[in-house]
Amino acid sequence: MNRVYNFSAGPSMLPVSVLQKAQADLLDYHGSGMSVMEMSHRSKWFDEIIQHTEAGIRKVLNVPDNYKIGFFQGGATQQFAMVPLNFMTTGTADYLVTGNFSKKAAEEAAKFGTARIAASSKDKNFTYIPDVKAIAYDPNASYIHICQNNTIFGTTYKDVPQVDGIPLVADMSSMIFSEPTDVSKYGCIYFGVQKNVAPAGMAIAIIRDDLLGKSAKGIPAEKIPTMMNYTTLLDKDSMYNTPPCWCIYMTGLVMDYLQNEVGGLEEMAKINHAKAKVLYDYLDGQDFYNNPVQPEYRSMMNVTFTSPNPDMDKKFCAAATEAGFVNLKGHRLVGGMRASIYNAMPAQGVNDLVDFMEKFRKENA
């Protein structure tokens, strides 16, 4: 088996042991005589799968009992519209814009009310996170929205807004399950699964009970399209229609992996911090590559860097691919390179990448 180190921002690497388990079950899931891909979502087998997956998420994240968990199609991008449709009860919400996806979320929310930009880091090309304690929030805001880890620009929040009476909504697509999270700080957490959880095709939302059953100002709850209505979908246990069955199954396997092989999110965080430290320490210790992010806001999951010029960046990416380090090309908005070192990236992959980077530097400096 000749597997490469895949540094893609998403879809991304999955743990090999999870892939092997899925492979073993592929043709005959637990004596059912069929694949999870083939079985009815109303079958007893799939009922066991979805219950197992939800229980796994609750245990791994320590989700309080007053939160519901939903499995949705449409990815995190669909959540950009679902959040304001369901939660913007006052007609306004505060958005902290720290990158491309929080910008898109604010633009989508503006279709349903006022998406007030309470703070932005655009002035320094999104290389930092605004001080959340120094922001003047709108007391009439229905919620405060953040993208907690910025995949494209390689930044992350070290602290999150906490304002009495205003729920916090967070897109955690590129950092969920990378470290312990105090779910009780949030009204809603949502994430696309294709970065750090499962194959592409699903988003998961964790929503506090008291936020359900509402709607954007001027839009009666019964007028929200059925497949965009959190309450309707959660009342049907995410099975109003056929859910993304395979993604739900794979998410359950990843929850098993995090519990049984890693030992929980505290252990996962130690591993992830160590991996990121290796790469950032190398970047800081030489002058051929540059990481533009202010150190206190650096992402543990997405590490951005450039070489001396765009032509050298292209040469680096081509050489890296040839050497078995794939998908290191940076996002088109920022260029350069990006190493996404999610949970499934082994420490050896980061060590080997650093060795390759040093070899390339010596040959091209």
Language-model features and meaning:
Residues T77-I144:
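PLP-dependent aminotransferase-like
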Residues V169, V183-Q194, A203:
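Conserved active-site segment immediately N-terminal to the catalytic lysine
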Residues Y289-A319:
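Conserved PLP-binding catalytic core of the aspartate aminotransferase-like
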Residues R3-E54:
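A glycine-/small-polar-enriched, mobile loop at the entrance of the PLP active site in fold-type I
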Residues S32-Q79, N86, N100, E108:
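Conserved N-terminal alpha-helix of the aminotransferase class I/II PLP-enzyme fold
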Residues P15, V193-Y280, Q294, E363-A365:
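Active-site C-terminal subdomain of aminotransferase-like
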Residues R3-V4, E322, H331-A365:
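PLP-dependent enzyme catalytic core of the Aspartate aminotransferase-like
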Residues G10, A109, S121-I176:
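Active-site phosphate-binding strand-loop segment of PLP-dependent enzymes
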